[in-house]
Curated annotation (Swiss-Prot):
Phylogenetic placement of the source organism: Bacteria, Pseudomonadati, Thermodesulfobacteriota, Desulfobacteria, Desulfobacterales
Organism domain of life: Bacteria
Family named by the database record: Belongs to the universal ribosomal protein uS11 family.
Name listed for the protein in its UniProt record: Small ribosomal subunit protein uS11
Subunit structure comment from the entry: Part of the 30S ribosomal subunit. Interacts with proteins S7 and S18. Binds to IF-3.
InterPro entries according to UniProt: Ribosomal_uS11, Ribosomal_uS11_bac-type, Ribosomal_uS11_CS, Ribosomal_uS11_sf
Entry annotated with the keyword Ribonucleoprotein: yes
Biological role: Located on the platform of the 30S subunit, it bridges several disparate RNA helices of the 16S rRNA. Forms part of the Shine-Dalgarno cleft in the 70S ribosome.
GO terms under biological process: translation
Keywords: Ribonucleoprotein, Ribosomal protein, RNA-binding, rRNA-binding
SUPFAM superfamilies, A to Z: Translational machinery components
GO cellular component: ribonucleoprotein complex; ribosome
Keyword RNA-binding attributed: yes
Length: 128
């Protein structure tokens, strides 16, 4: 008879404050919740919530992703957060509003979108 392999139970940390990173591109929105040291507590994305194709880039999809990530983090005791927003996508504001509606105390909002000092050549203009 095979021996039973002992698995470690997931340790529930009690984290009071953390950092929420919202990466909003034109195609998707990714929300990552970390502790102050940068260790990931939970994450979610519009694509991971079941939105496919162009529906991933909607503000509603960003709101759902944000609610999902925050719900997982609040189960571990998260209460106050700092928010870092990156990217030009349509889900920026709605993801942020979903955080505040979930009951988290937002202490700081910072835009960390990388802006080139004339770096790489951008993609060609779309002709629709």
């Amino acid at each position: 008879m095979a021996k039973r392999v002992q698995t470690k139970k997931k340790v529930r940390k009690n984290i009071a404050s953390g950092v929420v990173h919202i990466q909003s591109t034109f195609n998707n929105t990714i929300v990552t919740v970390t502790d102050v040291a940068g260790n990931v507590i939970s994450w979610s994305s519009a694509g991971g919530r079941g939105f496919k194709g162009s529906r991933k880039s909607t503000p509603f999809a960003a709101q759902m992703a944000s609610e999902d990530a925050v719900k997982k983090a609040m189960a571990q005791g998260l209460q106050t957060v700092e928010v870092y927003v990156k990217g030009p996508g349509p889900g920026r504001e709605s993801a942020l509003r979903a955080l505040q509606a979930a009951g988290l105390t937002v202490t700081m909002i910072r835009d960390v979108t990388p802006i080139p000092h004339n770096g790489c050549r951008p993609p060609k203009r779309r002709r629709v």
